[in-house]
Amino acid sequence: MKKKLYLPAAAFLAMTACTNDLDVEPLDPTVSTANRVYADAANYQKALDKIYSVWALSGQDGAGGSDISDLDAGNTVLFRSWFTLQTQTTDEMKNSWSDPWCLDVNGITWGTTKNAPVEGVYQRCMFIVASVTEYLKTIPNAPEEVDKTRFAAEARFCRALAYYTLLDMFGIPPFITEENYSINPSQLPREELFAWIESELQSIKEVLPAARQGEYGRADQAVVDALLARMYLNAEVYTGTDRYTDCIAACNRVIAGGYSLA
């Protein structure tokens, strides 16, 4: 009986040793790793810029490249796909392009087959969620010259916007943060995800610059209120409780900050 126990024990020890041996940096200096990238303090800004860029760019290699290999670099740019699903499915716009996905969107007839804008919105929003989660796990170790609090708040806004988009378009996406990172993530009920996004936005708002006081194109307090206004406008759909008074208040704060409502 003892002999039978020795072999599993030896196998376990061997597996443990292999696992530790694999936890090393690649020897090839041309291979990018998190430790090598973030050794340069300037790369914290660049990584944040990359997170912002996912909304408007499909990848870093021009028209022929995409961050996600099975997504078309042209048809699945996040803002384009989001606009397509929000507008081409209404009487505001139709697109006569002959691609099958386009005809499906025109007629609101897509099903379980691949559809470029549907996959573009879902996969690229989840790409943002994953990127922000990794960024937030790394930034506490940034050098002192990095504005860690501000950068983290901007990244959290990008993730909140991605989750709002998923909430609105898909209902109950996988829920991943730096606290509950998992290969098999859980899903929050729609009303709980709404509450999480609202809380996240409220907690970062004061860290961000006042309206029109920050760098152009970066998150400020007004964009937080603008996103809250969008959420409150349809809160009854998401949670069963209307928030029209809160929507008006958020819109008034945006206007007071010097912006107009489109």
What would you call each of these model-derived segments?
Residues 19-154, 158-169, 174-192, 261-262:
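Short acidic-aromatic linear motifs embedded in glycine-rich loops, typified by GG[WY][YF]DAGD(H)
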Residues 1-27:
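Bacterial Sec-dependent N-terminal signal peptides
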Residues 144-151, 158, 193, 213, ...:
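Structural signature of alpha-solenoid helical repeat junctions
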Residues 61-87, 208-226, 236-262:
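Short, surface-exposed recognition loops and adjoining beta-strand edges that mediate ligand/DNA contacts
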